[in-house]
């Protein structure tokens, strides 16, 4: 009997000890509810900001951007540029290892940039690196990158989230499958990827920055429905959610356990029109559609006021952005222009969206109703990431089914070239990049190319203005809004925020 009691006492003591330990050392596990799924964990092969944001769990670049989109050193200590703008010499930090134990050094940088700049690899972000002529490892901590021609925004390319340093041993081991097996120098390493449900990352014990990371794990969970994301925060199923349904922002703000954040962004939302296809090859049709959309009403209906009507094709916070008089809402003028263009009774078309979350659905419904008022019947489709990759990003002009396409773009390099060239340069039609209007203008191409060859701010201003003036006049887009970024998190989560390009910053995140 005494023996049995003693065992019970030990069991009870064990349970109590375990409970005390769990309280003292509770796992710091964070769930992040995001608006759509991920396409790949290879940053060089991802066209969407979300996939690249999640990849920051594992990967780092030579440089990065802070939350004001200012350049910062990461794996690099410093850099110099030759007088002719052709050669970039980068000094690297020492003593850093990849998550598989491989040394981070100049040879690793060369392996990554050689892969990225080789067109034979067919990587979606190849266009960022196509100007690299060669990369040389001068010594273990010195890399020399030689360009084919001067490219004044190149250091911003090295700071882009795509320019991640992947373990060369992992690249050799996994080859084209590297998107499923990320190995970087970042604060977290892959735990589980359930491709239909979540990506879970865990603390990398060998991370090079002392005291980091502070979290034990992060689970990135795609939740397409806005209301469900908000509910997960309120029930404690998630500690961070983005984007937050605008209509629920006020409600969440009243919750004493949740902090709501509305921050400026460089995310421009727009509808591109395929100018190689009728009726969008007619400038009057494109002009008519711009008059047909009531942007201030769209801001209220779909974004609950957390956006501003677009005044250009580049968000105002990007350097060299030009602002114009916003398109007024004038359905009478729209119908007149359609009649002049030969469409007195309107026409039928398709309107696709690059996302299927609730806000995108609202934009589609609102736009569909607005177009109907001027005689245009639009069949709408909200795509998931897989559909978008296959039907939009993966098809060239001849086979593309894109007509009208609602999407968004944030220039993750923080400068004007990446806000313009991927979307308007002739060489950047899909599947190369994201010129979903299939727009082409030789003058625009020339102005954009010349702007990259000069470091003179006045000359850059002139060239970028000239390009934007033409684009605004020819209207391959219906520019809609520049978003404000609305996110929310549990008050006990710190150091986790949204970047202006809609990416995430979480390296020093902690759960109190």
Curated annotation (Swiss-Prot):
SUPFAM superfamilies: Periplasmic binding protein-like II. GO terms for biological process: dipeptide transport; DNA damage response; glutathione transport. One of its GO terms (molecular function) is peptide transmembrane transporter activity. The keyword Secreted does not apply. Pfam families: SBP_bac_5. One of its GO terms (cellular component) is membrane. Keywords: Periplasm, Signal, Transport. CDD domains: PBP2_Ylib_like. Its main location: periplasm. Residues 1-26 form the signal peptide. It is found in: Periplasm. The complex is composed of two ATP-binding proteins (GsiA), two transmembrane proteins (GsiC and GsiD) and a solute-binding protein (GsiB). In the presence of glutathione, interacts with the transmembrane proteins GsiC and GsiD. Belongs to the bacterial solute-binding protein 5 family. Glutathione binding may promote conformational change, from inactive to active form. NCBIfam families: PRK15413.1. Part of the ABC transporter complex GsiABCD involved in glutathione import. Binds glutathione. This is Glutathione-binding protein GsiB.
